[in-house]
Amino acid sequence: MTAPTVRPRLVIVDGVPMSALVAEPEPPTPPRAVIVAVHGGGTTAMYFDCPGHPSLSLLRAGAAAGFTVVALDRPGYGSSAPYPEAVALPEQRVDLAYGAVDRILGEKPRGAGVFLVGHSGGCELVMRMGADDRGADLLGIELAGTGRHYHPDAREILKAASRERRPAGLRELLWHPEELYPPEVLTGATVSPTAPAYEAQLSSTWARHDFPALAPAVAVPVRFSIAEHEKVWQTDAAAMTEIAALFSGTPEFTVHRQAGAGHNVSLGHTAADYHASVFSFVERCAGAREDG
């Protein structure tokens, strides 16, 4: 069996170029399902293809496990970065994401269906896609690196953050303990040089308003993953009880705690273990879909 290949893709959706990275099972094997991964702030789809460490790549591991994996450059990143007016509104971003997935997949088989993975700021788009009318057709959703309440230390640091300024202490929130990550990752290999303007508003409205407003509308299984060394969000039992209660419309809400991981759970030394747990959940959702 040859190692999976990751290919860049570019499609046009409503006049906006949308870029992505794609990995597929070796032909002629049809995919078990399609996993669409959405990165967080300050990075790109490269987040899901850890540079220099193919064993830590969600894209490569997913294809090897029998899934088609599409890692989107979130609207406002990658090829869509020069089109701020086309990504300013949440509904625009949802339509662009769904449109990009449809164009990338085309007539190719989708197996049991499409499953969404969101990390950090990417959870906002994934949640909006899940709460959309089209979300009822999804297999399920994986959320990681997000929450309902900021950790007290993070709250003070993030207050000073802006598109132009990275406040002191931000690196420690996102990348510590440093020994959790390969050295190459810590040099900024996955960092995006730009960020869309709409993210400034998201940082102030997501936890307080958007998350609790969207969660009840999600009607598919949800898994919520917490890194052992998460420093941005409150992850204690009380916080998780509150979050679970928000997902009143989902048939299943599961919490997964990933040992040995920091906030950037798909780039650390334990990323392969984390990704394997995601694939297991996707398989469970696919089996439930097939069983009717």
Label for each model-derived stretch:
Residues 218, 224-226:
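Short beta-strand/loop motif that positions the catalytic acidic residue
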Residues 1-28:
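N-terminal cap/lid segment of alpha/beta-hydrolase-fold proteins
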Residues 94-112:
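Conserved acidic catalytic loop of the alpha/beta-hydrolase fold
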Residues 55-81:
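Conserved alpha/beta-hydrolase
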Residues 252-292:
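Catalytic active-site module of serine/aspartate enzymes centered on a nucleophile-bearing elbow/loop
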Residues 228-261:
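Conserved loop-alpha-helix segment in the C-terminal half of the alpha/beta-hydrolase fold
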Residues 29-64:
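Short, surface-exposed "cap/lid" segments of acyl-processing enzymes
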Residues 46, 73-88, 264:
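Glycine-rich "HGGG/HGxG" loop immediately N-terminal to the catalytic nucleophile
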